[in-house]
Amino acid sequence: MYLSAERLAHANQAVKEAFGQCSVAWQAIPHWDTGDPGQLNVANGLLGGSAGFLSLGPPPSPPPPPTPTFQLTVAELIAPTPDALLTAVMAATKTLANFFDTDVLKQCFAAAPSPTNTLTFASTNAQDIQNSLIAARVLVENAGYRAPSCLITNTVGLQVLNQLVSGYYNIAEQILAAANINSLYRFEPLDGTAQTRVRMVLIGRRRRIGQGAAPDASPGEEPVDVAFSALPSLEVDGETSTGTIQFSPRVRYAARITDATGLVALKA
């Protein structure tokens, strides 16, 4: 109605690409499409008495950030080039990806069983960081996840991993190798704190998944995956009271923690 089919397809592709480039959870956690955009619930992937269902929905948008919508004039929409549309799409999609990551990664951090899979660093010196990450490696390997793991850390944690020993030697590569970690991401918040202290979550792997390669991985074998009933796309909301047209990038999903023993939360 407001956009040609070609331009709407172009905008939808921009949402998908921008979401994939901006979202840590999209890059680090395998996902799958339920195939039904109207689906409301999905199996949680657990067995026995723990089997149940999860609701599929958009990510929560905690105040004060508003829901990621944008408005454009008709003139901007029918312009010879889609520059205004694509600029607005990418800005709103970045916000949507942040809400998505906050929701999914907080769930991963909180799902690590306590006290067995919740580790506290004795200190933030190089040896203690390495010892704790090796201990996390042992936990996920004992749970059956022997492929190289994925580590997601906040900014303080990234600084600690990259501390200089003797004033010039960066230890990150050696620590990650010792802990059998082949992919590293930075995101915050990972829990409800102010993120002034180290927070990390280690995700075990059954199959080798490279940096940013989770979208191509099989989700059923990993300790966490994300089910989507609506993949990243653009919703045309309609005309506003000021005569502009409102659009919303959207996703509908549920994060499924299918085996919490494959997750380890680390903090200082």
Residue spans for each PLM region:
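Extended, solvent-exposed, turn-rich assembly/linker loops in the middle of proteins
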Residues: 112-178
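Short, surface-exposed loop and linker segments with low hydrophobicity and enrichment for Pro/Ser/Thr
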Residues: 3, 16-22, 133-150, 156, ...
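Flexible, glycine/threonine- and acidic-rich loop/arm segments that mediate assembly and lattice contacts
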Residues: 1-102, 237-268
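Sequence/fold signature of self-assembling virion shell proteins
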Residues: 2, 25-37, 164-268
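Alpha-helical scaffold segments that mediate packing/assembly in large oligomeric complexes
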Residues: 72-139
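Generic structural hydrophobic/aromatic packing signal, biased to beta-strands
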Residues: 67-72, 136, 151, 184, ...
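Short secondary-structure junctions and interdomain/linker hinges
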Residues: 22-26, 99, 103, 140-147, ...
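Intrinsically disordered, low-complexity boundary segments flanking structured domains
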Residues: 13-15, 54-59, 136-140, 170-173, ...
